[in-house]
Amino acid sequence: MATLRVHPEAQAKVDVFREDLCSKTENLLGSYFPKKISELDAFLKEPALNEANLSNLKAPLDIPVPDPVKEKEKEERKKQQEKEEKEEKKKGDEDDKGPPCGPVNCNEKIVVLLQRLKPEIKDVTEQLNLVTTWLQLQIPRIEDGNNFGVAVQEKVFELMTNLHTKLEGFHTQISKYFSERGDAVAKAAKQPHVGDYRQLVHELDEAEYQEIRLMVMEIRNAYAVLYDIILKNFEKLKKPRGETKGMIY
């Protein structure tokens, strides 16, 4: 039978790491998870996440609508100037030209909520990673028979994988919001007479507000579901075959 020789000192370090990680994880499950469930549930009940009238989220969009007469005169002068310039230089000027207004700020209400949400995403992702590692360290040596406990471990691990995938999407969603809002603001600045672009900015803010509430809810639910399923199956997860056997890793 092939065996892997491991120095006692190295094995001792691995054992210390394993014991420390298991202790941290069980402390998380016993006290930290219930605390986070309560905190996030309270966050969901705050007025900041329960705005009934979404029009109150509207942020100032300081993009003036130019006077049509002045714009027409300006356009005529521009056309005359373009005739006298080379095509490449004209294109360069167009690329370098800024919007016909000052800086347009982010929606402060949305930014404030995101500043509270992003640390929660980071936290739950790290805790989920820790619990996943703990579960993997409970997997026994692969053997025939008496694998019901191992099947329970696999089901819980599958749940954790799905939660991790969902949490990864939160960062993408936040970045996508700012990208799409920036594009909408740029279009509104470039074509200030088109009201649809202005309205698009407000629609994106309202949609992001609802997404933020859903993300907080999903994080709370992730803590609650993990806490519940691990608590109900703790014995099977900890000792899938009724006794502690060698780690698979």
Swiss-Prot record:
Gene Ontology biological process terms from the UniProt entry: antigen processing and presentation of exogenous antigen
Superkingdom classification of source: Eukaryota
Entry's induction text: By interferon gamma.
Assigned keywords, A-Z: Proteasome
Pfam families xref list: PA28_C (PF02252), PA28_N (PF02251)
GO CC aspect terms: proteasome activator complex
InterPro entries: PA28_C, PA28_C_sf, PA28_N_sf, Proteasome_activ_PA28, Proteasome_activ_PA28_N, Proteasome_activ_sf
Ranges for region Disordered: 59-102
Compositional bias of kind Basic and acidic residues: 68-98
Keyword Kinase: no
Family listed: Belongs to the PA28 family.
Function recorded in the entry: Implicated in immunoproteasome assembly and required for efficient antigen processing. The PA28 activator complex enhances the generation of class I binding peptides by altering the cleavage pattern of the proteasome.
Name of this protein: Proteasome activator complex subunit 1
Lineage: Eukaryota, Metazoa, Chordata, Craniata, Vertebrata
